[in-house]
A protein has these predicted regions:
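Extracytoplasmic/periplasmic substrate-recognition and gating elements
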Residues: 80-83, 165-166, 205-270
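C-terminal capping/gating helix-and-loop segments adjacent to ligand/active sites or protein-protein/ligand interfaces
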Residues: 53, 228, 270-277, 288-311
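Extracytoplasmic/periplasmic solute-binding protein
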Residues: 54-63, 68, 78, 93-145, ...
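Glycine-centered hinge/linker elements that transmit conformational signals in sensory
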Residues: 97-101, 141-174
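A structural signal for short loop-to-beta-strand junctions that line the ligand-binding cleft
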Residues: 7-8, 39-77, 98, 109-112, ...
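Short helix-initiation/N-cap motifs at beta->coil->alpha
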Residues: 1, 15-16, 89-96, 171-185
């Protein structure tokens, strides 16, 4: 960005650079292109576009959204005599009772980690706060809150400590995500929080044993919570009028309903648009992904996850 030597299309990702790029003046405001094409603009929620805006102008076009929930191992639940809830455990206490039951059968209940961003522990932590009533949910949907000393945050921290102490693997403290995911693939833990991008790994014999996909079920976090946040969108890095038009045309192509479904089927990317009709063929070819799409509407609480790694 500082050099000004940008490609015509700038891919944006986890390290959201929208504001930085917009401030630099090196990327193009694409608000007018959205306004001139209402059908395209309708693909995105106001929240999606606001997230990709700077000073009221849209600079990024999101190609997916980020959600996460709990994956569980059906065989391990059966071994423990547990029946998984259709949607979610009603309360965290109910969830802990299930963890105690799993533990009594010598089954490690959950995957957690602390290295790097502590991704898995972060998702548990976000859920603990985000489902703690209106106040907790508001906190988890506030960007850069200034007060982390409220009772609900303190309580969530204590609950996370409880999970690390009692319900996870011995290598969780200091452990990296990849190792903890492998524990789940190898049926060494019963539950792991993550998003739909992980589903293709369940089918890959490079990651998981053959047939593992059929062992996996999903549920929302206790209290029917689900992380759901907009994602940083791709930007136009040219000022040449003809190249801008071509870049916008590509962004439109990239976000057609057909291509959003292709990204879902091939890479597990969640469609950014909520008005896409999911074909019956997906229910046959990838029933777990179809279940992910179905369960989203049953979430009582939705929230972000960034707050958990600001501590």
């Amino acid at each position: 960005i500082s050099s000004g030597d940008l490609p015509d299309i700038v891919l944006n990702g986890g390290n959201n650079i929208t504001a930085l790029a917009a401030k630099s003046g090196k990327v193009t405001d694409i608000t007018e292109y959205l306004d001139k094409d209402p059908e395209w603009k309708a693909m995105f929620s106001d929240q999606d576009l606001e997230f990709n805006s700077y000073e009221g102008k849209v600079y990024g076009i999101p190609v997916s959204k980020e959600i996460s929930y709990i994956y569980y191992n059906k065989d391990l639940f059966k071994k423990a005599g547990l029946e998984a809830p259709d949607v979610a455990y009603e309360t965290w206490d109910d969830f802990y009772k299930a963890c105690d039951t799993l533990k009594s059968k010598n089954i490690t209940p959950v995957s957690m980690d602390t290295a790097d961003l502590g991704w898995l522990s972060n998702l548990w932590y976000s859920g603990l706060i985000g489902t703690a009533g209106e106040e907790g949910n508001k906190f988890m949907n506030t960007m850069y809150p200034t007060d982390y000393t409220s009772d609900l945050v303190v309580n969530a921290t204590e609950q996370l400590q409880k999970m690390l102490k009692n319900y996870t693997t011995s290598d969780a403290a200091g452990g990296k995500y990849d190792t903890m995911a492998t524990h789940f693939f190898n049926s060494e833990v019963a539950m792991l929080p993550n998003g739909p991008w992980m589903i293709p790994d369940f089918k890959s014999t490079d990651k998981a044993p053959e047939g593992f996909y059929d062992k996996v079920g999903i549920m929302l976090l206790p209290g029917s919570g689900m992380e759901s946040v907009p994602t940083p969108g791709d930007m136009v890095g040219t000022k040449d009028p003809e190249k801008v038009k071509a870049a916008v045309a590509f962004l439109k192509f990239e976000t057609t309903a057909e291509n959003q479904l292709k990204a879902l089927e091939m890479a597990g990317l969640q469609p950014v648009s909520s008005n896409i009709e999911v074909p019956d063929s997906l229910k046959e070819s990838d029933p777990l992904m179809a279940e992910v799409l179905d369960i989203q509407s049953k979430a009582k609480y939705t929230y972000g996850q960034n707050q958990a790694y600001w501590y």
